[in-house]
Amino acid sequence: MSSRTIMAFDFGTKSIGSAIGQEITGTASPLKAFKAQDGTPNWDDIEKQIKEWQPDLIVVGLPTDLHGKELDVITPKAKKFANRLHGRFGNQVELHDERLSTVEARADLFEFGGYKALSKGNVDCQSAVVILESWFESQWG
């Protein structure tokens, strides 16, 4: 088992959640949510986080419907975001199915903090945690 550091993003047009995890443990922790305008974040803020954590790989959640079919509007924007991450920072970037990650994130947050924990930023970051932990599970098959 590798000891790579992996960063994940839960892409959204208004907010992009992030998380960090270690492949050796298969666990992830929330980082921060970045405000975005139509899916475009402040790239300087993203760069600071990438420089701070120096991930070996970045995972971006791929929005799909319940059947795994790509969505017309948001899926291409998430792919564009992933391509821009790779182009700007040179990191290897993988897309990973994010089906139901927000539902699971909301349930996790509510369990530990009630309604007060359900802020948009918290949900987006916890969604990134769910995406990353799901990616870890998919690697261990």
UniProtKB/Swiss-Prot annotation:
Keyword Cell membrane appears in the UniProt entry: no
Record InterPro entries: RNaseH-like_sf, YqgF, YqgF/RNaseH-like_dom, YqgF/RNaseH-like_dom_sf
EC numbers on record: 3.1.-.-
UniProt cross-references to Pfam families, sorted A to Z: RuvX (PF03652)
CC per GO annotation: cytosol
UniProt keyword annotations, A-Z: Cytoplasm, Hydrolase, Nuclease, Ribosome biogenesis
Subcellular location: Cytoplasm
UniProt-recorded name of the protein: Putative pre-16S rRNA nuclease
